[in-house]
Amino acid sequence: MPFITLERILAHTSFFLLFFVTFIYWGKFLYINIKPITILGEISMKIACFFITTFLLIRWSSSGHFPLSNLYESSMFLSWSFTLIHLILENKSKNTWLGIITAPSAMLTHGFATLSLPKEMQESVFLVPALQSHWLMMHVTMMMLSYSTLLCGSLLAITILIITLTKQKNLPILTSYFNFPFNSFIFKNLLQPMENEILSYKTQKVFSFINFRKWQLIKELDNWSYRVISLGFPLLTIGILSGAVWANEAWGSYWNWDPKETWALITWLIFAIYLHTRMIKGWQGKKPAIIASLGFFIVWICYLGVNLLGKGLHSYGWLI
């Protein structure tokens, strides 16, 4: 079987597995919680990670260079990074709710690479002389791993903000619960006539318990967001430094203020501020989450926005 055919089979199969996993995790979050299906989702994520790993190894073997030379390969590597982070976090935290964030991230990134990019961009190409360097693996790998970890940490921070916005709103919680058809029937026919009693002392205790559980969830999200970003920041630092050394070898200058370099520096500064507020100022919860949420958009601008729309040494020139 030709390598290109095997690559396509692995790419499309892994995408559908990630789509299936995303459906399971979100289905479990919204309404369905069947243990065998949850286990099937966990197994499917492991298989998807294995398939993407195999895809990257085959691409590496057939092209003769590490598969990070174009947007398609880097997007596939980013998707693989999301699946790896998912498996690590799920194993460390023993919580399946993290898959609500990581599974869609892997699926959407994979879908962008597999379904959106033109066929000519998905083909393996020979490296230009400037990229034929041992720094390719070091620099680009560190940058892509930092992107995936920082994006996951930022998504956890965004989740904190969403939960915080509803933390003190008890009635919307009740309303959202009764949005399901069967529960809505119970509410309208059995509970609504007792509207005055619905806010009784016991009900208020239930709401207090809900807010306590939300407070616990916010603390756990805040902890994992901090830990993941703390991992991504040194990876980003190593990626920028190795890129500077590589740039000096290739172009004779450590820093050229290329759009990619500029936005990488902005990304570094945003997450440096985040870590400063956590480690030095002792901030927790909403305030650092706002900074990390800003970092989420900055990372995407740095990775895709500059590459696709900007002009410079790192531009893929697809949209312009």
From Swiss-Prot:
For this UniProt record, give its keywords in alphabetical order, as a comma-separated list.
Chloroplast, Cytochrome c-type biogenesis, Membrane, Plastid, Thylakoid, Transmembrane, Transmembrane helix
First-listed, main subcellular location of the protein, grouped into a coarse class: plastid
Q: Please give the InterPro entries that the UniProt record associates with this protein.
A: Cyt_c_assembly, Cyt_c_biogenesis_CcsA, Cyt_c_biogenesis_CcsA/CcmC
Q: Which domain of life is it from?
A: Eukaryota
Disulfide linkages recorded for this protein, renumbered to the chain, are: none
Give the GO cellular component terms, alphabetically. Answer: chloroplast thylakoid membrane
Kindly list the places in or outside the cell where this protein is found, as annotated in its UniProt entry: Plastid, Chloroplast thylakoid membrane
Question: What biological-process terms (Gene Ontology) are attached?
Answer: cytochrome complex assembly
Give TM segment ranges.
14-34, 37-57, 68-88, 97-117, 143-163, 228-248, 263-283, 289-309
Q: How does it sit in the membrane?
A: Multi-pass membrane protein
Which GO MF terms does the UniProt record name?
A: heme binding
Q: Which family is annotated?
A: Belongs to the CcmF/CycK/Ccl1/NrfE/CcsA family.
NCBIfam families attached to this UniProt entry = cytochr_II_ccsB (TIGR03144)
Give the quaternary structure: May interact with Ccs1.
- Quote the function comment for this protein: Required during biogenesis of c-type cytochromes (cytochrome c6 and cytochrome f) at the step of heme attachment.
Q: What is this protein called?
A: Cytochrome c biogenesis protein CcsA
